[in-house]
Amino acid sequence: MPDSMSHQMIMAFDFGTQKMGIAIGQAAIESSTPLALFPMKDGIPDWNQLLKIVKEWQPTLFLVGLPLNMDDSESELSARARKFARRLRHQTNITTWMVDERLTTREARDELESYQEQGRAKKIAADSIAASLLIQSWYRAPQGVQP
């Protein structure tokens, strides 16, 4: 991993219209931890609350899941996720990348079962685990597209 990436604190978002998964990761140790679900109102976050979370964790990079169809086409949800990512970048001036989130939901559900077996799933949902998986995929291949 390039040295410039090793000190990054990464925050990832699995965008949704009713709720959004959030995770935080530390690039130096390639960690990723799902956080509690964030409520959304028709795809719009409470920006004051979201910015409090950002201030608390002080990320240096944002990843926002890009919900693509299996044929690589974008959907209405893709456009809304891009809009969220652009506004997030504008509100914070933090570098923001869109990352392909296909297949993370299925993987996240499997991971959630593991959390439930360990009794750690009270506030964690598949959406937050999906955000955590976005960070893990970034560690393996740090590539994305501009919002």
Curated annotation (Swiss-Prot):
Domain of life: Bacteria
Subcellular location: Cytoplasm
Record's keyword annotation contains Cytoplasm: yes
MF-aspect GO terms: nuclease activity
GO cellular component, as recorded: cytosol
Enzyme Commission no: 3.1.-.-
InterPro entries (alphabetical): RNaseH-like_sf, YqgF, YqgF/RNaseH-like_dom, YqgF/RNaseH-like_dom_sf
Coiled-coil segments: none
Enzyme kind, highest EC tier: hydrolase
GO biological process assignments: rRNA 5'-end processing
Keywords associated with the record: Cytoplasm, Hydrolase, Nuclease, Ribosome biogenesis
NCBIfam families (UniProt xref): RNAse_H_YqgF
Stated family: Belongs to the YqgF nuclease family.
Function: Could be a nuclease involved in processing of the 5'-end of pre-16S rRNA.
Classification via HAMAP family: Nuclease_YqgF
Record protein name field: Putative pre-16S rRNA nuclease
Originating species: Acinetobacter baylyi (strain ATCC 33305 / BD413 / ADP1)
